[in-house]
Amino acid sequence: MAVGTFRPEIEIWSTDVIDAMEPDCVLGGLVDNKKRTLKPGSHRQAVMGLSWNREYRNVLASSSADTTVKLWDVTTQKCMMTLNFHKDKIPVVQFHPVEANVLLTASYDRVCAVTDGRSPNNGTWLGLPAKPESATWDAANPYGFYCSTEEGELLCFDVRRTDAPVLRQKVHEGPCTSVSVNQANPRLLATAGEDGFVRLWEAGETALRQAGERNVNLGNVFACSFYESQPHLLAACGTSQDLCLWDVREVEALAGVFDQPAQEMAEKVVFEASENATGTLNDIKKKRK
């Protein structure tokens, strides 16, 4: 398990060890706790996002307030690559679930980037109307992803169409802090917001239909996620520091949804940089004005 903190380091913990006193290893951070002396390849500020590669289990991606994304080899505890194409803090980094070399990032510079780690300067850049809070790949469309914003909107993009989002809808009053796609039923989404609600949505081609909602009594809700092994379970947490587990089968609109066979994502996906993307954020920003 990888844990990011307000420090420029990543803790790696073994879930097989009960009551462990310290992590198995630490990626980056200070050299022997010396002030102002960082390990080679370390982030310089807080770690905001983490993502394990599903194909190469020793590879971890991290995003930071220092505006960089780093790829780590956990076995050697070293940084393999640093990506620095964003211009502001990066709260989101996500490996693609099928194409192991593809990364999704979202930054406070109001840009989402889909890049290939083998050629990180060539990618697809998509502008956002507000700062991002969360993002995740669309399990129903291997070329798509969802991104939530500080203005309470949820947007769905297709990297083959860079002119406009496929879907854009207001889902919360205040920031929409988290979005999760159900892996067994990819058209089922969950969102969480600082308004204290967790909401369930059924995704259509161009709009979302609300299937249910719950005030989970957690204060401002900062995260929600479906449990992959038990896709009817949804976890959420917030400022109350408590954890809420919701069995969404109790929602009338979802009756029978989990009785259907789980859908599978495509085995192979080919990503190419969009025709109007040069790989330079300054150029992309000029085109957005």
Give the label of every model feature segment.
Residues 1-5, 60-64, 103-107, 145-149, ...:
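Conserved beta-strand element within WD40/beta-propeller blades
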